[in-house]
Amino acid sequence: PRLIADVRGVLDRHFWEEGPGLFCDEWNRDWTPFSSYRGMNANMHGVEALLAAYEATGEQVFLTRAGRILDMFTARMASAHGWRIPEHYSADWQVDPDYSGNPMFRPAGTTPGHSFEFGRLLLHWWDLAGRPGGDAPANARRLIERALDDAWDPARGGFAYTLGFDGKVAIPARYWWPVTEAIGAVAMLLKLDPQPSDEDWYRRMWRFADT
């Protein structure tokens, strides 16, 4: 509890932006402004932390904040961009389509592996929240299935690292982590909202991961 409280204090003072209900990304060591960059990735990992904090403490604020972040990037941003999630934003949370940072950590375009992760986190939040009515399961499936269709390499297996906003492969490298996220996402679908095609995808991806 002490560690969670200490971390929450730092996040509340420096990173959480109550207006949009999102985390900013970065500061200098003395807490002076470093950049105006805003990103999806920090918020995605923020959701992971918030859900873990909720499970550890039962404090509703953590679940509520996770839900606000998820709504922004799934119900709003993904739905407006063909169920692909833009990665990079300006300080007022407008999509920055021209941003291109470090190709490993802040690549241009969209990242299918993050769609898998967001889909899994949306289902996790929905389950913890008592499975309320609404579009969470359907939106999670839309994210996951779009990434499966866009990025799977039918000849070699695995997923392309990045896509353009049109869904075309930008960086074809197939790293280990997107397939692990995809396996976890489809496992959540099988647990919470199963469809006949899910088992086939689950086994197909495990066969690739085992090679």
Regions found by a protein language model. Name each.
Residues 1-211:
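Glycan-recognition and catalytic cores of secretory/periplasmic carbohydrate-active enzymes
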